[in-house]
Amino acid sequence: MITSSILEAAQLLKQGQVLAYPTEAVWGLGCDPFNQQAFQNILELKHRPIEKGVILLAGHLGQVEHLLQSLAPKIRKQVIDSWTDRVATERATTWLLPADEHIPIWIKGQHPLVAVRVTTHPLCVELCNAFGGFIVSTSANPTGEKPALSLQQANQYFSNQIDYLNE
């Protein structure tokens, strides 16, 4: 299914579906990070090993603030500034942060850290906010293939195996 409704897309995520959506650079695949079956579906679609881990994509700082608590104040300020400073937000910055006890093991793979980005893409911001928190994000492509740059390319890779959020 292809939808342009943020609320419908958020509901699909809550129901355990995998969703393709545009991000700052390429199309991404996402799911509810706490739904292990949805996450497993992404790994199978991409032919990706679980050990690699994925990015958590947030709509605003508050959705991932708990992951900043263990950072030294100087580092925490640097991370926050990269996500909130007007000039810095013109590019997407992903940080590796200490995973707390709330981050499922399947998200971080074999690593003690988790990749986190507070998105600046308006559609992704709305999607995360409507979902009610951060979501899984990984490029929309099978491992070894070029990431999808459009809805059409994502659809060529995954056709009716997933749902799509179009702008």
Model-derived regions: residue spans:
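Active-site-adjacent structural elements in enzyme catalytic cores
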Residues: M1-E167
